[in-house]
Swiss-Prot record:
Disulfide bonds: none
Domain of life: Eukaryota
Compositionally biased residues, Basic and acidic residues: 836-900, 925-1011, 1028-1081, 1090-1125, 1149-1165
CC per GO annotation: eukaryotic 43S preinitiation complex; eukaryotic 48S preinitiation complex; eukaryotic translation initiation factor 3 complex; eukaryotic translation initiation factor 3 complex, eIF3e; eukaryotic translation initiation factor 3 complex, eIF3m; multi-eIF complex
Entry protein name: Eukaryotic translation initiation factor 3 subunit A
Keyword Manganese set for record: no
Positions of region (Disordered): 589-613, 836-1173
Protein family according to the UniProt entry: Belongs to the eIF-3 subunit A family.
Organism field: Drosophila persimilis
Residue ranges annotated for the PCI domain, each copy included: 319-502
Major subcellular location class: cytoplasm
């Protein structure tokens, strides 16, 4: 018996019952069984499954069973992702909301537990336990409480987010929900400071994006080529970037920036300026935290350009603040190294150039920026003119003016302004240290151009904002990175610049303000300077020489141009043609590639659609099959459940069923359950009777003894209680009387005291009434006037309102009347359409019935034809068997007989030739021709099957069911064809058997040597004489003559087939030449019968040959069609035949034309007659 499974609504009720009795695990198992059962997946709608799913997820959250919730969510997604996406979204949001609420409650509970612990003992705050715990684990009470109470719920919530993201990552209908859950997960990491989970979440989202990009060609799923998908992914990555910056996870922020840049590059739509501004701002922040001042300044410059170009309502203060930020960030870039290729020997993974190129791509720059290029761009954008005077001076002092003695003092004033400025200026404070380092480097470079040596003390006075150690470090860095010739003499506390005049490693290119070159640079470029000066002097001494040289050179150039201008012109034209051809070739290739890509995408789309359609059809069929099975199973379960419920209505039935589990109940039938119920009832009755008897005795003795002992005790207790009650009543009554007397005395005294105030009260009331009477009258008049005006106003409003109501009522009645008429017209049209549809349906049913009757009639005809075919086939088989049996009997009778060949034959007369040609055919030939008849009958059946197939094709236009009749008749023709083949194989087997028998039993003569053969005496012409009648090949001649005589005496037989007579060895007068007759025996001394013969099957024409059909169908034609043509190969007249005609050529009664048989008149019907067979 199949396992019993509950319906979803019953499972929900049972789960609620388990929850009420405190068994949530059993309730969860009950609901889980429903989702594990494949029967209910497609049998119910979301209105039935959704409440059950909410209860299922509620239990999973309560029990912290995230893996069970995942199983249910995936099953629910498979059920309703293509049917009702809103239901799936509601379920997932409800699940996450429940998990978040439980996590927040756990956090509040953890905080409350810590507060209770902290306020437990105010006198002893630091308990020994808390001291020991803090020393062992280094955690406070809050951390321990969170680990115990909050951390399990945090883990459950994190798993829930991951499950939902995995659930929705490839669902194109839930993209918005997927990205909402991703943002909720970011908020979760921010709220609970989960950095490791945040990294895993970023990796998970990045992996999902890679999967989407890989499967972008598929039509089923999320496609990154859609604009909506790209925008959602971009917004999610921007939110991820904000969250990473808030959590100070700069590596994840950089990866998010790479993802954002990739999405913006992938999108065909230009990102909005607000998004680009946010992108550049976050990118500048990441570069700043990474310590890359160069790209930080480049990002701020891009942000400044974007804001200045696209923001129309930008105020002057905002523009000034942004310009100051960009200028200070650019000036704070450290001075570049003179030989950056040295870093290649230190870096292990990638060269700095590759890293810089990769970062430049994020900023949309063609090549990595440099400090010089950024300052040049800042000047081009007129940034120094937009900032305040102080920052403009800062730019001039660092990049334009050469004043090393006052440089640090000037920069210090700017630093003080930044440090003491307003709040918005404090945003520039991170650039102070970088600005100081750049200033010190500028100071060292400018000092090296002015002084050859300087003391440390003096240099420290000039560098006001650094100590000796920082200054020495900067000097070493300048030597290492900037190729400055600096030597520090600690003994004399002095510094020497450019002392080695023989060393100059590179060409000096001044960066910033410069006064003069270094001595080593001057020595290195002395020859260059000398050459320049000498060239200038020569041009002054010989002013015309250069002019003559230029004229001569010009003449040569013109001459050379005239020589090659044609060739160059042709080359240019040819190059232009090559370029055009190349463009056309590239364009053709691009067009072909686009067409191929479009064709491929179209083909993939078509295949995907076909696959999806096929999948949907298979799913529909599977759902229908499962629904049908579910209905059958539900009926069985319902009947069993009704029986169980009928038994469980009684108390003893419930008790009996409680002892059995569900599996045990399923294994029982109704009779077994009724038997157990009766047994349980009998057993309970016996137990109850025995208990009642035992308790009767016990209660009787016990109650009697107890009451006898209670009587004196009850009497004593009642007496004491009466005395105590009387005393209590008397004391209570005395107290009540005393309280009543005291209350009356107090009330009387109060009344007497208040009587003196009555005159004063009356006087006051009279005076107050007189004072306010006039005011009351005036207000009353005003009120009456206002009341009258309001009454008139309301009356007028009521008149207007009633008029409007009547108008609206009239319009509503008109509209209702119009709608009623339209409804009547619509109903009449619908009735007419239904009547027309019903008429069409009846007409179709009549046509179907007519077609069905035709099909039944045709089927009856086909069955009759098959029956006739079978009867004819059996008749032919019987005839072959009878003839074979008769030939076996005749073999023993005609073989011993024989005779000499007629002398006329020996004389070579024509009559003799005709006589021996018409001798009886051998048995093997008759059997073989019988097989040929069967085969020809099979071929006729095959042609009949073809005709029936064509008839079936014609009937196919009338309906598909008629086609099966043609197929059956086609199979009938094939069966008859196989029957003919079997008959042919039978004839072949008989012939082989007779050929393999001995010489005495065979009509053929074995080939023997001439000496053993006993050939006849040759005549004078040298040809062998015909053998005597005693030879083996003439045995049976008398039998043939007797048979021929019998044939003549039979008279005409109209129902006999001529071919059957010929096949059985008979001959006819005036038979004419036969197509299969052999030529006359040649005078070669041999026996023509001994020569090997070809099989008749080898001589036959194909079944479709017209001549073959004419020969085989000769019985249906007249004598004219069977008469031999004149001048045939074996005519009975003419000298060549050796004589005139004989008695065999005379017409006999058997040669009379057979009467024509009636042919079927109905050409549309198919039937087979015995003649056709």
């Amino acid at each position: 018996m199949a396992r019993y499974t509950q319906r979803p609504e019953n499972a929900l009720k049972r789960a609620n019952e388990f929850i009420e009795v405190g068994k949530p695990l059993r309730a969860l198992d009950t609901l889980q069984e429903v989702f594990r059962n494949k029967r209910w997946n497609y049998a119910y709608s979301e209105t039935v499954i959704e409440p059950l799913m909410f209860k299922y997820l509620y239990l999973c959250v309560e029990l912290k069973k995230s893996h069970i919730a995942k199983e249910g969510l995936f099953q629910y997604r498979n059920m309703f992702q293509l049917v009702n996406v809103n239901s799936l979204e509601n379920v997932i949001r409800g699940y996450l909301k429940m998990a978040e609420e439980h996590t927040e409650a756990a956090q509040a509970q953890s905080s409350a537990a810590v507060a209770v612990l902290e306020l437990d003992d105010l006198d002893n705050i630091a308990t020994p336990e808390s001291i020991l715990m803090s020393a062992v684990c280094g955690e406070d009470a809050q951390d321990r409480s969170d680990r115990t109470i909050l951390l399990p719920w945090v883990k459950f919530l994190w798993e829930s987010y991951c499950q939902c993201l995995e659930l929705l990552r490839v669902n194109t209908h839930c993209e918005a929900l997927y990205h909402d859950i991703a943002r909720m997960a970011f908020q979760f990491c921010l709220k609970y400071n989960r950095k490791s989970e945040f990294r895993r979440l970023c990796d998970k989202l990045r992996k999902h994006l890679e999967d989407i990009c890989k499967s972008s060609n598929q039509t089923t799923g999320v496609s990154i080529n859609k604009v909506e998908t790209q925008q959602l992914c971009l917004d999610t990555r921007l939110y991820l970037l904000d969250s990473a910056i808030q959590m100070e996870l700069w590596q994840e922020a950089y990866k998010a920036i790479e993802d954002i840049h990739g999405l913006m590059a992938l999108s065909k739509k230009t990102p909005v300026p607000k998004t680009m501004a946010n992108y550049y701002q976050k990118l500048a922040m990441v570069f700043s935290k990474a310590g890359n001042q160069l790209f930080h300044a480049a990002a701020l410059l891009k942000l400044f350009q974007l804001t200045r170009e696209l923001k129309k309502n930008l105020t002057k203060d905002d523009l000034q603040r942004m310009a100051a930020h960009v200028l200070l960030a650019t000036l704070s870039i450290p001075l570049p190294s003179a030989h950056p290729e040295f870093d290649r020997f230190i870096e292990a993974d990638k060269s700095p150039l590759e890293k810089a190129q990769k970062l430049a791509v994020l900023l949309g720059l063609p090549q990595p920026p440099t400090r010089v290029s950024l300052i040049r761009e800042v000047v081009r954008l007129n940034v120094p003119q937009l900032v305040s005077e102080d920052f403009r001076n800062l730019y001039n002092w660092l990049e334009v003016d050469f004043n090393p003695l006052n440089l640090c003092k000037r920069i210090q004033s700017i630093v003080d302004i930044i440090e003491t400025g307003p709040t918005e200026t404090n945003l520039l404070s991170p650039y102070i240290q970088s600005l100081k380092d750049v200033t010190i480097m500028r100071l060292i470079r400018q000092i090296s151009q002015v002084y050859e040596s300087i003391e440390f003390k003096r240099l420290l006075e000039l560098a006001t904002f650094c100590n000796i150690f920082e200054l020495e470090k900067l000097l070493v860095e300048s030597v290492r990175h900037n190729d400055m010739q600096i030597r520090i003499d600690h003994q004399k506390n002095s510094i020497y610049f450019g002392t080695d005049l023989t060393e100059s490693q590179r060409e000096y290119r001044p960066d910033g303000p410069a006064l003069q070159s270094m001595p080593s640079e001057q020595i290195r470029s002395q020859l260059v300077n000398m050459s320049t000066v000498l060239t200038r002097a020569v041009s002054i001494v010989y002013p015309n020489r250069e002019r003559d040289q230029r004229a001569k050179l010009r003449t040569q150039m013109v001459h050379h141009y005239h020589e090659i201008k044609d060739r160059e012109h042709q080359r240019i034209l040819q190059r232009q043609k090559i370029i055009e051809d190349r463009k056309e070739y590239i364009e053709k290739q691009n067009n072909a590639r686009e067409e191929e890509e479009a064709r491929r995408q179209e083909e993939e789309s078509r295949k995907a659609k076909l696959a999806e359609q096929k999948r949907l059809e298979l799913e529909q069929e599977e759902r229908e099959r499962k629904r049908h099975q579910n209905e059958i199973q539900a009926i069985k379960e319902k009947s069993l459940k009704e029986k169980v419920q009928q038994i469980s209505q009684t108390a003893h039935g419930k008790k009996m069923l409680s002892k059995l589990d569900e599996e045990g109940i399923k294994k029982l039938d109704a009779e077994q359950i009724a038997k157990r119920e009766s047994e349980e009832l009998q057993r309970e009755r016996k137990e109850l009777q025995s208990k009642l008897k035992s308790q009767e005795k016990k209660i009787d003795y016990y109650e009697r003894a107890k009451r006898l002992e209670e009587i004196p005790l009850f009497e004593k207790y009642l007496a004491e209680k009466q005395v105590k009650d009387k005393e209590f009543w008397e004391a209570t009554e005395k107290t009540r009387i005393e309280n009543a007397i005291a209350e009356r005395k107090d009330a009387v005294s109060q009344q007497e005291r208040l009587k003196r105030m009555y005159p004063d009260r009356d006087e006051f009331l009279e005076a107050l009434k007189k004072e306010r009477a006039s005011l009351y009258v005036e207000k009353l008049k005003k009120f009456e006037i206002a009341l009258e005006a309001e009454r008139k106003k309301r009356l007028a409003d009521r008149v207007i309102r009633r008029r409007e109501e009547r108008r609206q009522a009239f319009l509503r009645e008109k509209e209702e009347e119009r709608l009623r008429k339209e409804e009547e017209i619509r109903l009449a049209q619908a009735a007419e359409e239904r009547a027309a549809a019903e008429a069409r349906r009846l007409e179709r049913e009549a046509e179907d019935e007519k077609r069905r009757a035709q099909y039944e009639k045709q089927r009856a005809k086909e069955e009759e034809a098959e029956r006739k075919i079978k009867e004819d086939r059996d008749r032919l088989a019987r005839e072959v068997a009878v003839e074979r049996e008769r030939s076996d009997k005749e073999r023993d009778t005609w073989r011993p007989r024989g005779g000499d060949r007629p002398s006329a034959a020996a004389a070579g007369g024509g009559g003799g030739a005709g006589e021996w040609r018409r001798a009886a055919a051998p048995i093997g030939d008759r059997n073989e021709r019988a097989g040929d008849r069967i085969e020809r009958g099979g071929e006729r059946m095959e042609r009949g099957g073809d005709r029936m197939e064509r008839g079936g094709d014609r009937m196919e236009r009338g309906g598909e069911r008629t086609e099966r009749g043609g197929d059956r008749m086609d199979r009938g023709g094939e069966r008859m064809d196989r029957g003919g083949e079997r008959g042919e194989r039978g004839a072949d087997r008989d012939r082989e058997r007779r050929d393999n028998e001995g010489a005495d039993s065979s009509w053929r003569v074995r080939r023997e040597p001439d000496s053993q053969r006993g050939a006849g005496v040759k005549d004078a012409s040298g040809s062998a004489a015909p053998p005597s009648r005693d030879d083996k090949w003439r045995r049976g001649g008398d039998r043939d003559r007797d048979r021929d005589r019998d044939f003549r005496n039979d008279g005409p037989r109209r129902d006999r087939d001529d071919r059957d007579d010929r096949d059985r060895g008979g001959f006819r007068r005036n038979d004419g030449p036969r197509r299969n007759d052999d030529a006359a025996p040649r005078e070669t001394g041999g026996n023509w019968r001994d020569a090997p013969r070809q099989s008749d099957r080898d001589n036959r024409r194909p079944a479709g040959d017209r001549r073959d059909r004419e020969v085989r169908g000769g019985d249906l034609r007249g004598p004219e069609s069977r008469a031999p043509k004149e001048g045939g190969p074996s005519g009975g007249t003419g000298t060549a035949a050796g004589g005139g005609g004989n008695w065999r050529t005379a017409p006999g009664p058997r040669d009379e034309p057979a009467p024509k048989r009636d042919q079927p008149q109905d050409k549309g019907k198919f039937s087979l007659t015995p003649v056709q067979l």
